[in-house]
Amino acid sequence: MDKIDRKIISLLQENARYPLKYLAQKVFLSSPAVSTRIERLEKNGIITGYHATVDPVALGYHITAFINLTLDPKQKDEFYPYVTACPNVLECNCVTGLYSIMLKVAFPSTMELDTFIGHLQQYGNTQTQIVFSTAVPPRGIHLPQEEEEEETAQNQ
């Protein structure tokens, strides 16, 4: 992966709907060359998909929460299909610490969140944090360009 690939990835993370012509202008290549690079990045599993970013509140999902869960490893085969089928689960991560699972969920109301937590508790103890506000929304991975890498190396 070179600096052009990193620039293409950064641009696509900014807006996955940028036209090829715009991307090509930004990286000083032809549209077919950019298309070939994007296809290679997809084939290599670096670009894994394209998604619309939506406002959950505008869609009626006023409650975002993080739920920690203690899960016995023997329950994983039963738990993973269950949680995968729950449309309100935005993320499910295996984590270190007192709890083994961290879920990010969105619900229209605290009553629906409470019902979901009740179902989760068949798998283990939970701890829930409701989000009041988000200072840094989900964003892409920052890929330093060569100039930044050189600057960092010089400052060390």
Feature roles, as predicted:
Residues 1-156:
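A compositional/biophysical signature of low hydrophobicity enriched in polar/charged and small residues
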